[in-house]
Amino acid sequence: MQIVCLDLEGVLVPEIWIEFSNRTGIPELSKTTRDEPDYDKLMRGRIAILNREGLGLPDIRKVIEGMQPLEGAREFLEWLRSYSQVVILSDTYYEFAEPLMRQLGWPTLFCHELVADESGRVRDYRLRLRDQKRESVKAFRKLKFHTVAAGDSYNDTTMLAEAHAGILFRPPENVATEFPQYPVANTYEELRAEIVAASRVR
């Protein structure tokens, strides 16, 4: 049995925080895990900026409602789900993900939770598990799944290392340079070929 683990943002959907940064005109919010490997530092900074600017969960959701999956993502995911078990491992939040998951046909998603007050002001975030991507892949391997993982950012590299095969999808140059051991796919056709090459399905 095989399972393919995919990151969400940058692989199937646009980066939510970059889109929100563009819509609000706050460049500080454009920083992502492609730029900052320390996730807690990244999130604490985001929450501080949101509170400083008087922005909350409703403002972010409004932007997400207008977003769509990356071009070709739905077709790629449809093929992949017919080929292998698939799970999305993401450092996004359930409070963000619903509109995009609906457009992708409700794939299985493991992610985190935001803590917001009654007014929608973001107070904190709650991790499902520290380094949950890696821990999920480790658990799948323990369950005797042949695991293939694909992602684009620093926070994906531990799950790529834990999987039987790891693939970088459209990574920024700094990530590709620091992790040359992983093949790079720049299109869904290339990603499909890399997954098939690493598979034990057919």
Question: Can you name each region flagged by the protein language model?
Answer:
Residues 2-113, 117-118:
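Alpha-helical substrate-recognition element adjacent to the catalytic core
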Residues 110, 182-191:
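Short acidic-hydrophobic, aromatic-tinged amphipathic segments that line or gate anion-handling sites
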Residues 94-98, 156-157, 192:
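Short, well-ordered alpha-helical microsegments
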Residues 117-125, 176-183, 193-197:
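Short, charged, surface-exposed secondary-structure boundary motifs
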Residues 94, 161-163, 196-202:
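An extended, acidic
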Residues 95-147:
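Substrate-recognition "cap/lid" segment bordering the active-site pocket of phosphatases
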Residues 86-91, 145-186:
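Acidic, Mg2+-coordinating phosphoryl-transfer loop and its flanking beta/alpha structural elements
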Residues 78, 138, 157-158:
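Alpha-helical segments flanking ligand/cofactor-binding loops in enzyme cores
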